Amino acid sequence: MSQSLIVALDFPGKQDVEQFLRHFEGEELFVKVGMELFYKEGPAIITYLKEKGHKIFLDLKLHDIPNTVKSAMRSLASLDVDMVNVHAAGGSSMMKAAIEGLEEGKQEGKERPICIAVTQLTSTSEAMMKKEIGIEKTLEEAVAHYAKLTKESGLDGVVCSTLEVPKLREVCGSEFVTVTPGIRLASDDVNDQVRVATPKRARELGSSYIVVGRSITKAENPLEAYKTVKQQWEGVTV
């Protein structure tokens, strides 16, 4: 299950990434490249990470008109990344266009990247959703609605909180992919995320993938922190 543990490379540039990855010589990681790093370094950072043997979740959360998203996904698929995402709030036509773009852009002989949709950010509380975003449903209802729409649009799964995974299993089935950020070791600060969980709790709730950032990247010993998270995620007793 180690390949379903995704390490968030939330760094401002390649130099920081190189320094961090020195702790993981010989390890093939599944890493997340977000907006900050990709916008600074461009496709070259993807090439660098692929050459190191790492799998890549390119976390750009596309949200635009269908034709623009289709064209963007065609370009992203050509980078040979393993996972990409969009905002479910973009609607069914946009999500279907994303899949079309990925199919057109995928490298010959390769499967298209896994495509998932963001339901609600883990920094979103129910009060914020109702007051600022204008959604009157409960948070769980809103996430379930977006997840169902995502599945009907042909995507592979969603980004969601661990707390929502059991409900989404009911709504979308056991094969529907759930990628859960907001993962912290019990001793860590939650920082700016509201809906968080430990690796053990994520496993118990049925997450397909977990995304772990600061618990590993800010640790005094990132490799040891990675091993601790991995052990908890895989249910290994040491």
UniProtKB/Swiss-Prot annotation:
Homodimer. The active site is at K61 (proton donor). It comes from Bacillus cereus (strain ZK / E33L). This is Orotidine 5'-phosphate decarboxylase. Pathway: Pyrimidine metabolism; UMP biosynthesis via de novo pathway; UMP from orotate: step 2/2. One of its GO terms (molecular function) is orotidine-5'-phosphate decarboxylase activity. Keywords: Decarboxylase, Lyase, Pyrimidine biosynthesis. GO terms for cellular component: cytosol. PANTHER family: OROTIDINE 5'-PHOSPHATE DECARBOXYLASE. Gene3D superfamilies: Aldolase class I. The keyword Signal does not apply. Belongs to the OMP decarboxylase family. Type 1 subfamily. Its EC number is 4.1.1.23. It comes from the Bacteria. HAMAP family: OMPdecase_type1_B (MF_01200_B). GO terms for biological process: 'de novo' pyrimidine nucleobase biosynthetic process; 'de novo' UMP biosynthetic process. InterPro entries: Aldolase_TIM, OMPdecase, OMPdecase_AS, OMPdecase_bac, OMPdeCOase_dom, RibuloseP-bd_barrel.
